[in-house]
Amino acid sequence: DVQLTVPSILMALLVDGIARGIISREMHDEMAIYVLIFAIGISEWPQFARVSRAATLVEKNKDYVAASTIIGVSNLVVMFKHILPNIMRPILVIGTIGLALAILAEATLSFLGVGVPPTTPSLGTLIRLGNDFLFSGEWWITFFPAIFLVLLAFSINLLGDWMRDTLNPKLN
């Protein structure tokens, strides 16, 4: 619960700062994408943990799990054949929302100059580099990457909404 109170960008900046302090600049430039993935993953994992724990606790107390346990099915079989398939629906929905948030976090960090190096293509880097030309009449250098970023995040969120509506048996 404590990690949920820390903004994901701040957590990613902290992890990236620690990585920059531990490893050399050349090594950091080579491993920047992995550090970025780790930083965003560390900042986003509490949502997945909370949803999967809540869904597991709900499924664990259902009658079919008790019946499987009574007839002698092992805990691993109950977990992988009964509980895991039933908790995948909310995890997939949260995963699509998490993917959109991860893309926005990467673009934000790259825009701030903390993400991937300038030689690696990134929407945030393109937007940051286009800001230098924004007032010189070449607005499209910033506009099109920004619009693409917004449309990408919006389409992934629409996919998550569609999955939620399709996979939720209570809405059918």
Feature-to-residue mapping (PLM):
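Alpha-helical transmembrane segments of integral membrane proteins
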Residues: 1-172
